[in-house]
Amino acid sequence: MINKILDAISNALNEEFGDEYEIYSEDIKQDFKEPCFFIICLNPSEQDFLGNRYLRKYLFDIQYFPKNKKNLNSELYSVQEKLFNCMEYINIDEDLIRGLKMRGEIVDKKLHFFVNYNVFVFKKGPQDEFMENIKINMKTRR
């Protein structure tokens, strides 16, 4: 599921910002091209629910490395506003998932945009064996 969400985030970023912004999800090389995004999943968790249902919580950090060093804050604020809009709903397997607890931080001249995606999953439990045959004797009373 993490990879599906990561792909959906990448698609939403590409739709919003276009092809001139590189999107990375693996280690960034030293000579990476700016402007770019780096996406990482932080501390996924799972909570038990009724039956075979589980709530998985995925926190993503979308880091933005700006191109313009002169108007740095202006560019970072502008990108952050766009991220609030494009990360609210992402499309996974023709379903929409809503981003929650969105917030942004500017640290070391780059933007960290945090968003949670919570998803219910169903796990198949052990299957019970079925009886092969059953014989029923029925008598009617009068």
Language model feature labels by segment:
Residues 24-33:
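Short acidic low-complexity segments
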Residues 34-42:
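A short, hydrophobic beta-strand-centered structural micro-motif
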Residues 1-24, 44-142:
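Charged, amphipathic alpha-helical segments and their flanking helix caps
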